[in-house]
A protein has these predicted regions:
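Loop-to-transmembrane helix boundary motifs in multi-pass membrane proteins
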Residues: 120-124, 161-169, 277-286, 294-297, ...
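Membrane-interface "cap" regions at the ends of multi-pass membrane proteins
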Residues: 10-66, 240, 270
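Extracellular/periplasmic helix-exit of transmembrane alpha-helices
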Residues: 208-222, 276-315, 386-390
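Helix-loop-helix module between adjacent transmembrane segments
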Residues: 10-11, 15, 56, 90-106, ...
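Membrane-interface loop-to-helix entry segments
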Residues: 5, 9-27, 129, 145-149, ...
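Hydrophobic alpha-helical segments and their helix-loop junctions in multi-pass secondary transporters
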Residues: 138-142, 146-157, 162-166, 174-179, ...
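Extracellular loop-to-transmembrane helix junctions
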Residues: 2-19, 72-102, 111, 122, ...
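Hydrophobic, membrane-embedded alpha-helices of multi-pass small-molecule transporters
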Residues: 47-64, 206-215, 225-289, 329-341
Length: 511
């Protein structure tokens, strides 16, 4: 329990100390935000701060801080330390700069910003990667909540394949509506209800877990290295922990969500609460579910091997909350987490493609032109992943590492932004290089031979993969420093204002 409480303290203190430091480095001021300087009535719409905070939390907190940490706590008590440290030093920094740099550049997404800060060549790679990843997010966050609907806790003995597909259809229809209509008409109105349910569900699971905190494992200071070898299947912490637990530590998906809220904020000075603070809250949610996961694995060790995250979640909830109405509320809360990330992932994809094609989104026709093909592709992936016995596992694995590559892209933008302004760029560069190392190591090492059920990778020897990944991270870090310095010397360059000269005139110029 002591290790768990230390982790919680790191998160809370981190917000008030390191979060304040990061805010000072950026330097929010009184300039007009996109919602006030260039409103469009669809995406750049002024909204109250409390709504923005709630929307940001619901957008970023998908199933990662629940199912991801339930699976990730298999690595042992070290998770209670690495999760909050990674959150404060990496994830919250990532989310803050994703939102604030976007706010300074008319609310543009990372692919558009990468044209400005990284160059046209890298931007094409970023655009491809993020588009694919967002489609995968939409598919994963449709299938998982539908599977949670189709559990005994919610439907008793009526669990069936038909019910699962009905749930998929209903969720997918909602996604279309929330992607297509103006943000204040659907998301801005329904999210307060979702937020209230999420808060109640989080409190319920926390109250259910508190009496069992005394069974939690502790970090072993007498034998430090033993903390790195706790996984029952022998998975190495590097890179597997940081791929398994994305949301909670750092998640590239968040960089696609922060710009959505950057378009609706009315002042830069609330950015730390909205972007940095909500990542801290997600970390706290992750800590609660990690504690629950460790408890249920102690009670039922058989769940450590073979049980899916959804299965472990169902058993945990029914065990710590035996009263049916409350256990139903908790599962509904988890479903909300998934749905409120799935809807905005597809909305973000629509905006990303629109920015890079120049299609104005005030037109109903233009929104349909982008939304319909996106949803058709996502539907095909959902159908395939559920018809193939290994389909969802394959989908989840590719989503996991592509999600972390998105984090690298966003941190690259943040590093160059800060370097070009001659500010402390190390706060973004260090987590950027670390996540580059993690994702490169994962891709180079992972394979069905090296890790059961893993996607195809290069399958290199573990130590060889580590060395190459370290070199990759160093090379990227050098490039970012050089790029940032060169931009700082470029005549007419302004990191805080969109400059059409750096683009191919395919992105609508900020007004």
């Amino acid at each position: 329990m002591i290790t768990f409480l230390i982790g919680v303290a790191i998160l809370i203190l981190g917000y008030f100390t390191y979060g304040k430091f990061v805010e000072r480095v950026f330097g929010p001021d009184d300039r007009k935000t996109p919602a006030l300087a260039n409103p469009d009535g669809v995406d750049r719409v002024p909204m109250p701060h409390w709504k923005n905070v709630l929307i940001q939390l619901l957008n970023i907190a998908g199933i990662g801080p629940v199912i991801g940490v339930i699976l990730g706590i298999k690595f042992g008590a070290i998770v209670f330390i690495l999760l909050p440290l990674g959150n404060v030093l990496g994830g919250a920094v990532h989310d803050y700069f994703s939102g604030m740099i976007s706010m300074r550049n008319n609310g543009y997404n990372v692919p558009a910003l990468s044209r400005k800060f990284l160059g046209k060549g890298p931007a094409k790679l970023v655009m491809t990667l993020i588009s694919v990843a967002l489609i995968l997010v939409g598919a994963v966050f449709t299938t998982t909540p539908a599977a949670l609907v189709n559990t005994p806790i919610l439907v008793g003995s009526h669990v069936s394949q038909t019910l699962f597909w009905v749930a998929v259809a209903v969720i997918f229809a909602y996604y279309f509506i929330s992607t297509f209509f103006p943000i204040d008409k659907i998301i801005g109105r329904i999210y307060p209800v979702f937020g209230a349910l999420l808060i109640l569900a989080s409190l319920a699971i926390f109250i259910g877990i508190v009496p069992n905190l005394n069974v939690l494992d502790e970090f072993c200071f007498a034998d430090i290295m033993s903390n790195f070898h706790k996984h029952p299947a022998g998975q190495p912490i590097i890179p597997m922990l940081f791929v398994t637990i994305a949301c909670g530590i750092i998640s590239g998906f968040h960089s696609t969500q922060s710009p959505l809220v950057a378009r609706t904020e009315v002042t830069e000075k609330t950015g730390r609460q909205t972007f940095y603070g909500m990542m801290i809250i997600e970390g706290l949610i992750g800590m609660i579910w990690a504690a629950g996961g460790m408890f249920i694995y102690h009670q039922m060790p058989e769940l450590l091997t073979g049980a899916s995250g959804v299965k472990v979640l169902s058993v945990l909830v029914s065990t710590v909350i035996p009263w049916a109405p409350i256990s139903i509320l908790v599962v509904v809360g988890v479903i909300i987490l998934a749905i409120t990330s799935g809807d905005t992932s597809l909305r973000s994809l629509r905006l990303t493609v629109a920015e890079l094609t120049g299609l104005e989104q005030t037109s109903v026709k233009n929104r349909l032109l982008l939304t319909v093909p996106m949803f058709a592709l996502c539907a095909v992936i959902i159908f395939w992943s559920n018809m193939n016995p290994e389909g969802f596992n394959i989908l989840w694995n590719y989503f996991s590492w592509s999600n972390q590559l998105m984090a690298v892209c966003s941190l690259c933008v943040a590093t160059v932004y800060l370097r070009s302004k001659k500010k402390n760029f190390w706060i973004a560069l260090i987590p950027c290089m670390f996540m580059t190392f993690i994702t490169a190591d994962y891709i180079l090492w992972v394979s069905p031979e090296n890790l059961k059920g893993a996607p195809l990778g290069f399958g290199l020897d573990y130590k060889t993969a580590l060395v190459i990944a370290l070199h990759d991270a160093a090379i990227l870090g050098f490039f970012l420093c050089v790029r940032g310095k060169s931009l700082s010397q470029m005549e007419g360059y302004d990191a805080d204002r969109w400059n059409s000269a750096l683009d191919e005139n395919k992105i609508p110029k900020a007004q």
